[in-house]
Amino acid sequence: MKGSIFRHPTPLPLGVSSGYVMTVLGPLPISEMGVTLMHEHILLDASGKWVPPCCCSDRHLAEMPVKMENLGELSLNPLMSRDNCQLFDVDVAIEELTKYRALGGETVVDPTNIGIGRDPNALARIARLTGLNIIMGTGLYLEPSHPEWVRTSSVEQLTERLIYDLGGAEEKPEVLAGLIGEIGISSRFTPDEEKSLRAAGRASAATGVPIEVHLPGWERLGHRVLDILEQEGADLRHTVLCHMNPSFADKRYQRELAQRGAFLEYDMIGMSYYYADESAQSPSDEENARAIRELIDDGYIQQILLSQDVFLKTMLTRYGGHGYGYILKH
């Protein structure tokens, strides 16, 4: 992997055991992370999730910018608007994150990765201007978002790419990733998604950097994912399983995953959308709170992570959404 040599600390602290986490502005002691959101997209191109309406009468909404007149329709089917799936504006990101900072937020983990609009230099600028610690992801999301070169790459080649992004190679990028993820797993769990997951496991084993895995929340693929990561040498205690909210009622499933060491991430807090592509409603905050309370009562408080997974314009306060500060405010 070719890159430029930049001035990073030598030796570069890598992985959980180093006591540091890598932000877009450099290493930060884990003890100084403070109030942290573990799963929020700052800049993102989620156009791959865009599903134009099938009804002729709704097709005008597909290319309409997000505005007051279509917020109601987008609450019922948020992915039918291409514009809603695009977070491109750095100034809007700064405005939204400044509100989170004012509420006491200190760190944001942004799992936007390769192929879905990751912008390292812009994230570094946003971190400087907001005063927030921003941790950037690496790896691959769902197969439709994979760059063409992924199809012909081996697990070894993908692993090498991730290690480079994390600063584990001799040559390093200017802005380093501090997380492997969010690694995309679909309900079809395609061969290329498995290849990507195996590379993530190997890169984590080599560097000690944690992994975040996007699970199809209404499915039950958690054990299969953990089995593969275990085969590749990853430490399951440094593995985050995302989108656990939809499986909140399956107590046995979630507790079995936690017993294997994984973190359970309830990252759909405040999300009230109906997802037409899943024919499913996001769990309510009451359902989330009850499930989290029961996990705490059962002794899993150290393995629960909370976030809101901001990834649409309609989730930003500028467009009538809760923004990044919902958990801290409510």
Label each PLM-derived region with a short phrase.
Residues 46-48, 120, 221-227, 250-257, ...:
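Histidine/acidic-residue-rich catalytic or RNA/ligand-binding cores of hydrolases
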Residues 212-214, 266-268, 300-321:
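Short acidic/histidine-rich active-site segments
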Residues 38, 43, 54-112, 116-130, ...:
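Alpha-helical scaffold segments that flank or form the walls of functional sites
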Residues 41-43, 113-114, 139-143, 182-185, ...:
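Active-site beta-loop-alpha junctions enriched in small/polar residues
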Residues 14-27, 31, 322, 326-330:
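Mid-to-C-terminal alpha-helical segments outside catalytic/metal-binding sites
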Residues 121-124, 149, 190-195, 218-233, ...:
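Distinct, well-ordered alpha-helical segments
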Residues 131, 207-210, 230-237, 256-265, ...:
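Glycine-enriched alpha-helix->loop->beta-strand junction motifs that scaffold or abut catalytic
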Residues 107, 125-128, 133-210, 263:
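Active-site gating/metal-coordination segments in enzymes
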